[in-house]
Amino acid sequence: MIYGRSLFHIIASLIILHSSGATKKGTEKQITPETQKSVQCGTWTKHAEGGVFTSPNYPSKYPPDRECVYIIEAAPRQCIELYFDEKYSIEPSWECKFDHIEVRDGPFGFSPIIGRFCGQQNPPVIKSSGRFLWIKFFADGELESMGFSARYNFTPDPDFKDLGVLKPLPACEFEMGGPEGIVESIQILKEGKASASEAVDCKWYIRAPPRSKIYLRFLDYEMQNSNECKRNFVAVYDGSSSVEDLKAKFCSTVANDVMLRTGLGVIRMWADEGSRNSRFQMLFTSFQEPPCEGNTFFCHSNMCINNTLVCNGLQNCVYPWDENHCKEKRKTSLLDQLTNTSGTVIGVTSCIVIILIIVSVIVQIKQPRKKYVQRKSDFDQTVFQEVFEPPHYELCTLRGTGATADFADVAEDFENYHKLRRSSSKCIHDHHCGSQLSSAKGSRSNLSTRDASILAEIPTQPVKPLIPPVNRRNILVMKHNYSQDAADACDIDEIEEVPTTSHRLSRHEKSVQRFCLIGSLSKHESEYNTTRV
């Protein structure tokens, strides 16, 4: 019976707890967005050594439906220690789902969580791993309590303990403004804010014109020690340099564009002594929201930028609307940007290439022409005169009709000789015709050798003296010069007078007379003799 009653009480307690939890959840869902504003609330004191912050109305009960966010920032190379050593009371719940304090190791609500606390027991001492702590206090609409009081201070970062006592950081701040501008880390060295071996913590304050906002776009970004935010980072603040206005922080390998909601932007760069090679370059553009005024350009992304930024070679809009129709201007600007040195180098190189091409073409044209001219200069026209201009023989008119038969024989002999010369003229060189004799004077010796071979084959016979016939008419013989060395062996006197007879001479006698006649013609150049028989 006792066990039955105990079991009944346990079941009843569970039902009550469940119903109360459902009521809490329904109340939590009824909280409006206006009551859940992530803003700082309660008391806050800050100084170089630390500070104190509390829940609203502490040590009285905190009001319902409240959400307060506190961000603590330490100096470079320092960490944060957080203490809850005063009276403390927050509504208890399972896993602190209702009223609670949430602490994260970093500057954002998505930073790694350290813990969530509620109830009557004070939280332990909390230490950050870096320069920031993010603390949120949340209260639902029921069961309020006294709240909390927290104290914090700064301690040296253990990651830098090997460096000993560090020098104070140099003052490093810049002021910029206007429709656009470039923020770059190289300004630190250019303006002598710090040396190349010093750690830097620099800030750039950007102020836009009235009723304008700021758009930031990275042109260059590189961290020497990527993913080590303690050693180097670039941070963007919207409205002030306070940690509550931290918009974005980059310490990895990628940096995204940032759109600010106010007209004041702060860029902060931190780099220790071993990260001075970290660099960035950022373009800021002041813009207004539509409707655009007359002296502005609409970027099709709810941005109105100054007309002077259109086609200036830089993308000032989120998308490159301001540079899309500037091809001609880009070409002109590219030529204008060529320095005198580069222009000279390009001009000289082009001239050298053109000269080499011209010389190469001339050489290719002249080389075969040279060979042709050389061969033409070696050509001796007298050597081939007998080939191209064979001699002409003309017969004189007859003084009578009685010697027609004898004269026909002479004409036939000359005609045969012409045919022989034409056929032999086709062989310019001895080896073309198979001759075994070498020629000292070109084709002239070919004919002499042929005639000599004919005479060599014919046996020599004594020449019978010719008796001049009676009652025979005289004929006129015209002799034309033809150079022939082989004719030197004949005596012209022996053939000066050639009697014409009615009887036929023997074939051998005709050959001898024909050979001597040709030889004599070669001795007397362009000479005409009249011989009366």
Curated annotation (Swiss-Prot):
Q: Which residues are glycosylated?
A: 306, 340
LDL-receptor class A domain residues are: 291-327
Subcellular localization is given as: Membrane; Postsynaptic density membrane
Q: Which Pfam families match?
A: CUB, Ldl_recept_a
**UniProt KW Membrane keyword:** yes
Endpoints of the signal sequence? 1-22
The record's listing under InterPro entries reads: CUB_dom, LDL_receptor-like_sf, LDLR_class-A_CS, LDrepeatLR_classA_rpt, Sperma_CUB_dom_sf
Sequence motif: PDZ-binding, positions: 531-533
Work out whether the entry's keyword set contains Hydrolase.
no
Extracellular face: residue ranges? Answer: 23-344
Species source reads: Mus musculus
Q: Which cysteines are joined by disulfide bonds?
A: 41-68, 96-118, 172-202, 229-251, 292-304, 299-317, 311-326
Q: Which residues does this entry mark as bearing Phosphotyrosine?
A: 417
Q: Which tissues is it found in, per the record?
A: Expressed only in brain. Present throughout the central nervous system. Highly expressed in the hippocampal CA3 region, olfactory bulb and tubercle, caudate putamen, and neocortex in the adult brain.
Gene field: Neto1
One cellular component term from this protein's GO annotations in UniProt: glutamatergic synapse
Ranges that cross the membrane: 345-365
Membrane topology, Cytoplasmic segments: 366-533
Q: Which UniProt keywords apply?
A: Cell membrane, Disulfide bond, Glycoprotein, Membrane, Phosphoprotein, Postsynaptic cell membrane, Receptor, Repeat, Signal, Synapse, Transmembrane, Transmembrane helix
Summarize the record's disruption phenotype note. Depressed long-term potentiation (LTP) at Schaffer collateral-CA1 synapses, NMDAR-dependent spatial learning and memory. Rescued by the ampakine CX546 at physiological doses.
Q: Which GO terms describe its molecular function?
A: ionotropic glutamate receptor binding
Topological relation to the membrane, as annotated? Single-pass type I membrane protein
Question: Where the protein is mainly located, per its record?
Answer: membrane
Q: Which residues form the CUB domain?
A: 41-155, 172-287
Listed Gene3D superfamilies: 2.40.128.620, Spermadhesin, CUB domain
- Domain of life, per UniProt, equals Eukaryota
The protein depicted here goes by the name: Neuropilin and tolloid-like protein 1
